[in-house]
């Protein structure tokens, strides 16, 4: 499913002395099956923007469309179900006595049949790479990475067509980060899911997304393919961001070895380029 935003403006605490414009005339489209990153410094409007995608926030002005239908009126409730949002530290929202009950919570609220709930929970726990053996355990007995997967399963079990992830690997160790992003990457590739990643990590964005939206002071500063956006290092630095560290390293290396290509975004690309140079040498 696709998302389209036109003329979206959002003002916090409108009409009070604390009024603040968080989004200012945002226009964007995210196509079905895309993997899009949204980056920006703290307070740039990233999280406020994505909370409009499933109606958690309502525009002060402007419109949000899901698959061509405006997120208002009689169809709004059904359209909202198509967008699942996983916020930072989602495991803090785990509360049931078993993993099964936590994952099933949303389905129970929807009034689905017990057999159907059982089938969907088992399917989803496998989808996030966990064993069905943990379904009877307390979620609080699990590791940090497992809790994060269980929390994500609680969203995925509702079968959204669009998955929004706000800093999905925050607080995890390097192994846990890699596992979460491999899970998300597989969901995108194998399930043809539209994925929107909000992140402060330029390395994660460079490695996984196809297109980047750069937010600054409630507006879209840049938008384009990941490689073309990260080439604009000066613009990124002016708004408090940066390209991935490996990009800067390869540019420094090119000063010493002019033959190498410095249009590099990931460690894997850097390894490949250096191996190519060594073979030629």
From Swiss-Prot:
GO molecular function, one term: ATP hydrolysis activity
UniProt keyword annotation of Nucleotide-binding present: yes
Domain of life: Bacteria
Keyword vocabulary terms for this entry: ATP-binding, Cell membrane, Membrane, Nucleotide-binding, Translocase, Transport
Gene3D superfamilies to which the protein is assigned, alphabetical: P-loop containing nucleotide triphosphate hydrolases
Membrane topology, from the record: Peripheral membrane protein
Enzyme Commission designation: 7.-.-.-
Compartment(s): Cell membrane
UniProt keyword annotation of Nucleotide-binding present: yes
Sequence positions that bind ATP: 40-47
Pfam family, one: ABC_tran
Disulfide cysteine pairs (residue numbers): none
Main location: membrane
Domain ABC transporter span(s) in chain numbering: 3-242
GO cellular component: ATP-binding cassette (ABC) transporter complex
Family note: Belongs to the ABC transporter superfamily. Energy-coupling factor EcfA family.
UniProt subunit comment: Forms a stable energy-coupling factor (ECF) transporter complex composed of 2 membrane-embedded substrate-binding proteins (S component), 2 ATP-binding proteins (A component) and 2 transmembrane proteins (T component).
Function: ATP-binding (A) component of a common energy-coupling factor (ECF) ABC-transporter complex. Unlike classic ABC transporters this ECF transporter provides the energy necessary to transport a number of different substrates.
Protein name as catalogued: Energy-coupling factor transporter ATP-binding protein EcfA2
Organism this protein belongs to: Acetivibrio thermocellus (strain ATCC 27405 / DSM 1237 / JCM 9322 / NBRC 103400 / NCIMB 10682 / NRRL B-4536 / VPI 7372)
């Amino acid at each position: 499913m696709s998302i389209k935003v036109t003329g979206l403006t959002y003002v916090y605490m409108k009409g009070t002395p604390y009024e603040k414009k968080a989004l200012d005339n945002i226009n964007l489209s995210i196509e079905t099956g895309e993997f899009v990153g949204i980056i920006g410094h703290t307070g740039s409007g990233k999280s406020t923007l994505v909370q409009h995608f499933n109606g958690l926030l309502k525009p002060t002005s402007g419109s949000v469309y899901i698959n061509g239908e405006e997120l208002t009126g009689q169809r709004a409730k059904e359209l909202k179900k198509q967008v699942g949002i996983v916020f930072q530290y989602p495991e803090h929202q785990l509360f049931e006595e078993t993993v099964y009950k936590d994952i099933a919570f949303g389905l129970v609220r929807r009034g689905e049949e017990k057999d159907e709930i059982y089938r969907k929970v088992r399917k989803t726990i496998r989808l996030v790479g966990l064993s069905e053996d943990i379904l009877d355990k307390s979620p609080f007995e699990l590791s940090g990475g497992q809790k994060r997967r269980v929390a994500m399963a609680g969203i995925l079990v509702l079968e959204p067509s669009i998955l929004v992830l706000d800093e999905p690997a925050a607080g995890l160790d390097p192994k846990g980060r890699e596992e979460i992003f491999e899970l998300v990457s597989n969901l995108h590739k194998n399930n043809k899911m539209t994925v929107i990643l909000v992140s402060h990590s330029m390395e994660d964005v460079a490695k996984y997304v196809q297109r980047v939206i750069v937010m600054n002071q409630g507006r879209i500063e840049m938008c384009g393919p990941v490689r073309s956006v990260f080439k604009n290092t000066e613009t990124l630095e002016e708004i408090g961001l940066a390209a991935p560290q490996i990009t800067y390293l390869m540019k420094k290396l090119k000063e010493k070895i002019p033959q190498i290509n410095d249009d590099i975004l990931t460690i894997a690309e850097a390894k490949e380029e250096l191996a190519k140079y060594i073979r030629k040498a």
